[in-house]
């Protein structure tokens, strides 16, 4: 298993390098999206990626809500979800998502969609404004100018996993479908992350979370099926072994008991002494006593041991051979008489 996992990690790294080298680096670093994904057992995943700036009709088509920033103060820290108010983050038994759209060059307005964060309370609005414009914007700018921008960065920050996507501009339609919808076809722009990495966290998206859950569920069912098959085969083998042992000890070295079989009594001491006194001639005349341990009554009394009746004598006319044909005459000499 460790070897297979190491091979998958190497394939993942090679595939990320391949798709990155085939794409051009985005020059626009101002318009970004930030996603928040929460789930059961305290699962929290965030993602930052580039976005095309020419999106329109956010309210009707994509159901985004505009919001104004309420603070301009910067907050020091590592800029994780710990900078947000914990009571503002909604958690449940199923996955909850929120997507924020913002232009880092214009820190007056941002758009949000989803139910993973509560935007109805003023305190929540204040913390999310600083989190987005002073935290996520700075992280994205540092990431784009970083020398290792051609790979996906996965950061583990306590109970949070943050995914820094490749510095490309994703369309809003693909972003909403990947981060805010649990079902549907994988968008073509995010297909590169799924082809060879179906069981790895690379984008922190909602569809990726469901793909991971399905993969783990299938692996669990496969392991349970293997355990069930192994247990069933083990039970069958143990049952056959017990049956063979019972037949061996019950039937006296015979694995298949004949019908009406009964064990003969064991030898007594007197019979043992008599057996020792037998001579070679006695053994020729009678059946040795020791063979009683192997022979069974049904063999002696079976009809297969009775000789068939002798055939009647052959009639005399069948015994006599027919007379041989007479020998063929010898060659004749021809005499020719000539007149004088």
Swiss-Prot record:
It comes from the Viruses. The chain crosses the membrane at residues 226-246. Coiled coil: none annotated. It holds the Pfam family UL20. Residues 26-225 are lumenal. GO terms for cellular component: host cell endoplasmic reticulum membrane; membrane. Residues 247-340 are cytoplasmic. Residues 1-25 form the signal peptide. It is a single-pass type I membrane protein. It is found in: Host endoplasmic reticulum membrane. Glycans are attached at residues 27, 54, 57, 68, 72, 78, 83, 107, 118, 146, 173, 180. Keywords: Glycoprotein, Host endoplasmic reticulum, Host membrane, Membrane, Signal, Transmembrane, Transmembrane helix. Belongs to the HHV-5 UL20 protein family. This is Uncharacterized protein UL20. It comes from Human cytomegalovirus (strain AD169) (HHV-5).
